[in-house]
A protein has these predicted regions:
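Secreted/extracellular ectodomain signature
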Residues: 2-6, 28-130
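Bacterial N-terminal signal peptides that target proteins for export
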Residues: 2-16, 24
């Protein structure tokens, strides 16, 4: 009888520990899933990902970007910047999408839409869930 009680306590403790581990992983992933991408002139950019808050990510991305930059935030997503290789200070495009492939394709499409001739991806970033 004593052995089965000890075994039951151990099983209960194991289940409790696994529940905490799974729940803790979910909390950490959600808590650190904000990012930002700053876009400037002539291919300048800044990126920040896996921050606890969008404002903190935006500030960090803008700090990395040279000159006047515009920041977009991403939460559980990816961002990409495409520039025209023939004219890096000319047409560019950026996108924020749930999947990296979609953001890369859309950024390139936007670059061509604004007159780019040889658009290439300059930079990309994803947060924890993107």
């Amino acid at each position: 009888m004593i052995i089965s009680t000890i075994a039951a306590q151990r099983r209960a403790l194991l289940v409790f520990a696994l529940t905490l581990a799974i729940g803790g992983t979910r909390f950490v992933t959600q808590a650190w899933a904000a990012g930002a991408f700053a876009i400037g002139k002539c291919g300048a950019y800044g990126q920040a990902y896996d921050y606890s808050a969008e404002d903190a990510a935006r500030i960090a991305a803008l700090k990395q970007c040279k000159g006047e930059c515009t920041a977009v935030t991403m939460k559980r997503a990816c961002a990409a910047l495409a520039i025209d290789m023939k004219n890096p200070c000319g047409p560019h495009g950026y996108a924020v999408r749930p999947r990296i492939s979609n953001s890369l394709n859309e950024a390139t499409r936007e670059c061509y839409k604004f007159g780019g001739k040889e658009c290439v991806i300059r930079a990309w970033a994803c947060d924890a869930k993107g």
